[in-house]
Amino acid sequence: MSVRNSRPQLSWPERVSPQRTIDTPTASGEMLTRRQSAPALVVPPEETTHVVVVKRQSPDAAAAGELVPSRRKDSVAVQSGIVATGPLDTTRSGARDDFLMALLECPVCFGYIMPPIMQCPRGHLICSTCRSKLTICPVCRVFMTNIRSLAMEKVASKLIFPCKHSHFGCRARLSYAEKTKHEEDCECRPYFCPYPDDKCSWQGPLRDVYQHLMSSHENVITMEGNDIIFLATNVNLEGALDWTMVQSCHGRHFLLSLEKINLGEDCQQYFTACRMIGSMKDAAEFVYNISLEAYNRTLRWQSKPRSIRENFSSFTNADFLVLNKHTVELFSEDGNLALNVVIRKVEERTN
């Protein structure tokens, strides 16, 4: 016969008896009623369970990414192969960091304020980007000054921030020194339409950019191969014009563009660009060559392709082939300009 262990009895504080009053005479003979204090109910502080993220092998773990119990009662282990991207919100330090990051929200753009952190004379914080556009504080309406909050800059240097593209799926958590660089080329950052006329407002993930070009910009054609001829027709027509096509090679898509810009009367320039439909990191793995040949003349250009992250309107400040009207006339035949484009992958150097 098995004997069932009785459950331990819970100890509750004794029931507080009804309050009794005690009459105390005063110096003048009046009777004052004094209320007897009831016994205080002491609630023990709730124990805080710390969560420690470790990386170890578990021979009997079910699958990758499964949480497996550690030997310590107050810790949780993560199976090897999963890297934690930031502190867990259930820890005390996570709650503290969330509170501090909430203090660093810009009241104008609602983004996190990164150093240099500006403040108004009354101490309200604002990011440097919004500060350059405002003359009065958006909170208290006093005139802004160029006062930096050095204390909050030190606080920001100790915090780990989420990527601003977290609502698109990015799970990276970074220091403020790494945050800006990561967000410029974040894989989850939406891409804008790379067509050079800047009239298309489409944006979406990288995997949909090429399909968008084919479906929404019918004049864009695709040529296969790493060595092609990009033919721009009627380059002598008046006005601002552009010619665009896609070159597919090395398992990638490259957007070739020739844009004619009027800078003034009788002053026209042609900007030739090769941009990769991909990230800036991927674009750095390739090199392209553009050559023009006509009437025993040869012009060659070599550079690295840019990513479509960069706006086409920034061509004048970028590293692209620029031709003036006279040069185009020298290399064009019957008003058509033929550009030989060769794209190759950069070979890794061996030590």
From Swiss-Prot:
Which parts of the sequence are annotated with region: SBD? 155-346
Q: What happens when the gene is disrupted?
A: Flies are viable. In combination with a mutation in ebi, flies show an extra dorsal central bristle phenotype. Flies that lack both sina and sinah show visible eye and bristle phenotypes, which can be explained by an inability to degrade the neuronal repressor, Tramtrack.
Recorded source organism is: Drosophila melanogaster
Give the Polar residues compositional bias ranges.
18-27
UniProt lists the gene as sinah
Please list the reactions this protein catalyses: S-ubiquitinyl-[E2 ubiquitin-conjugating enzyme]-L-cysteine + [acceptor protein]-L-lysine = [E2 ubiquitin-conjugating enzyme]-L-cysteine + N(6)-ubiquitinyl-[acceptor protein]-L-lysine
Q: What is this protein called?
A: Probable E3 ubiquitin-protein ligase sinah
**GO MF annotation: an example:** ubiquitin conjugating enzyme binding
For biological process, the GO terms are: proteasomal protein catabolic process; proteasome-mediated ubiquitin-dependent protein catabolic process; protein ubiquitination; regulation of R7 cell differentiation; sensory organ development
